[in-house]
Amino acid sequence: MRIGQGIDVHRFSDDPARVLFIGLVEIPGALGLAGHSDADVATHALCDALLGAANLGDLGRHFPDTDASIAGVSSKSLLEQTLKLVSDAGYRCTSGDITIIAEAPKLASFMPAMSEALSAVVGTVISLKATTTEGLGAIGRAEGIGASAVVLIEEK
């Protein structure tokens, strides 16, 4: 059994039409995050944790923001491709946990849908929770959103 940890942070977009996705779920009425893909911090942190656990580097190594062919890609696609890399390395995920760090928007009502969506793709329970930074730092000033993820993987 191996453990992996991932962290991701994105600032809010200047584009008022940008959609916010967290944990593969669209958060209606909220300003989206800036990024090369859909900027889903929870899913990106999960991907980084999976890649780290399998000793496969990080998300940027496999899906660089300089690759125009993946501009605007959905994080579901990144997660599916990440799981394939992990599987090809001989592992499968047995557990995952994500903490979303944000002052706004409030996400409690979206947590069950996020867990369901991520769990369906990964094939095991992915739990989620949210916290704030009590107004401290860039996230505390509501300049963006962050996420931290931890996973357990085992040999297939």
Give residue spans per PLM region:
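A short glycine/serine-rich beta->alpha loop
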Residues: I27-S37, D65-I70, G135-I139
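Active-site His/Glu-centered metal-binding helix of metallohydrolases
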Residues: A42, L46, L50
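Acidic-glycine-rich active-site phosphate/pyrophosphate-binding loop
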Residues: H10-E26, E116-V125
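N-terminal, polar/charged subdomain of small-to-medium soluble alpha/beta proteins
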Residues: V9-F12, I22-G23, G29, A42, ...
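Short, conserved loop-to-beta-strand elements that form functional interface hotspots
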Residues: S95-G140
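C-terminal edge-of-domain segments
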Residues: I139-K156
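Glycine- and Gly-Pro-enriched alpha-helical subdomains that act as flexible
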Residues: A49-R92, E103
